[in-house]
Amino acid sequence: MTMTLHTKASGMALLHQIQGNELETLNRPQLKIPLERPLGEVYVDGSKPAVYNYPEGAAYDFNAAAAASAPVYGQSGLAYGSGSEAAAFGANGLGGFPPLNSVSPSPLVLLHPPPQLSPFLHPHGQQVPYYLENEPSGYAVREAGPPAFYRPTSDNRRQSGRERLASTGDKGSMAMESAKETRYCAVCNDYASGYHYGVWSCEGCKAFFKRSIQGHNDYMCPATNQCTIDKNRRKSCQACRLRKCYEVGMMKGGIRKDRRGGRMLKHKRQRDEGEGRNEVGSSGDVRASNLWPSPLLIKHTKKNSPALSLTADQMVSALLEAEPPIIYSDYDPSRPFSEASMMGLLTNLADRELVHMINWAKRVPGFVDLSLHDQVHLLECAWLEILMIGLVWRSMEHPGKLLFAPNLLLDRNQGKCVEGMVEIFDMLLATSSRFRMMNLQGEEFVCLKSIILLNSGVYTFLSSTLKSLEEKDHIHRVLDKITDTLIHLMAKAGLSLQQQHRRLAQLLLILSHIRHMSNKGMEHLYNMKCKNVVPLYDLLLEMLDAHRLHAPANRGGAPMEEMNQSQLATTGSTSAHSLQAYYITEEAGAFPTTV
């Protein structure tokens, strides 16, 4: 059945009839929403079919009647029906709404909240939204396309997703560009201008290092060879500035492999970045190492080192076989201790132990694979730590006493005869007690001693060639091998994984305490030397001076130390050659084997 709208009032009545039936069907509260502007401005597209099939099967063709009827609302104003018509409409009880002339001049249209759709029920139970449109040609009810109002289409979703990805990529690229622009100089912490001589550095440090390696660099530090080098104080000491350049890894041959000139490198980098962006989606795993070029590609020239092919049990056997022999002291029980006599006994014992320490170090797996310069450097940095951990190990079975030799067992009270010795005695006794509490095994002890040797100077190499980096890499791999051996020993002892991790951490923490004791002992020994309490033997003296050149900043050193800096530097400059002479002598079999 088709109904035609002849008047404005009858059209409004039909609208309210439709809305009333809908609300009764859905059992929903009636809503009154004031129409703030013409419906033609609220609703859009009117190109949908205008025939609606009610559940009863009756059909109402509004398009046919729209041409013959006037619009419900005009653009210039609104007109309402007569009072009688409005009263008749109210009496009919279409939805129970009050007469139109009893409300404010603003018309009330029975629509749902935005998007103002009327969800009529289809016979199959689905809600199909319809909207009203005020056209100049007439009044029509049109079906609203759900995609236009409820959710974006798939194309819109893809487009918005691409926009979000593009904005995210732009932000990420901006962050990466800003990160690239904030490189700092490894020497003075100023802004880096580029990658020079193997490290990121500023123009000032680059030029300084270039002058130093091309000309004479016999710089002399006026203080303790430990001056602070930063942006403001980098020009205060040339010697310490050059030392720090070497420490951070500057080297004469440290030039990037992709160095081909500015313009070619720029084009290559842009091309690589473009290819990288295209491959991000397929790779799925962008590693941080790909963001920046590797400074240097270190070749593992010592891959075939026998030390790296040893099993854990073979490593332990090699370390146990390398242990030095037992050494006896010249102690005479009939003579009472004095400061000079005790220091004489201890320094004589240390000097003889140093001779055997060189032979022991050569038998540590992987040590002889290093250059002679680096072997000497490691020994100069670690000799007192090695002596102290051996002393602590021997004293485990003697609580409260230190076993310097089988015939020299000293307690804390006997150490008081030497000024400043009690503090060192207390630290040694505490470490021995800690070993005893942990029930340290001999296999673990030899591993710890080897770690001390290899780790002592690995970060203070003064070599300026690519070979020094290869040496460091080799040392790190041997250290990893020894650490794995320690873990193997703990697993072999039946410890759980958590207990293995805890014990390994406890053992390695003790090494830092031994380093602290070594620094204290070095200061004490140097003070004894300056006071001429006891003459030092040649090898011990050379090792002492060399260690002080490589050691970190001394804290609270005596004023006399600063007075002897030039003498120390002069003596220390020949220490490596003296120790190398011991190496050569030992190779020839001329080392004394006093035990």
Swiss-Prot record:
Region (Interaction with AKAP13): 262-595
Disordered: annotated segments: 149-173, 257-287
Residue positions, PTM Phosphoserine: 104, 106, 118, 167
Entry-annotated residues carrying Asymmetric dimethylarginine: 260
Region spans: Mediates interaction with DNTTIP2: 185-310
Family named by the database record: Belongs to the nuclear hormone receptor family. NR3 subfamily.
Record localization: Nucleus; Cytoplasm; Golgi apparatus; Cell membrane
Ranges of Basic residues composition bias in the record: 257-269
Residues covered by region (Modulating (transactivation AF-1)): 1-184
Top-level taxon of the source organism: Eukaryota
Region span, Transactivation AF-2: 311-595
Region (Interaction with DDX5): 35-174
Pfam families: ESR1_C (PF12743), Hormone_recep (PF00104), Oest_recep (PF02159), zf-C4 (PF00105)
Stretches with biased composition (Basic and acidic residues): 154-165
Entry's Gene Ontology molecular function annotations: estrogen response element binding; nuclear estrogen receptor activity; nuclear receptor activity; sequence-specific DNA binding; steroid binding; zinc ion binding
Region (Self-association): 264-595
Chain positions found as Phosphotyrosine: 537
Residue intervals of every NR C4-type zinc finger in the record: 185-205, 221-245
Protein name: Estrogen receptor
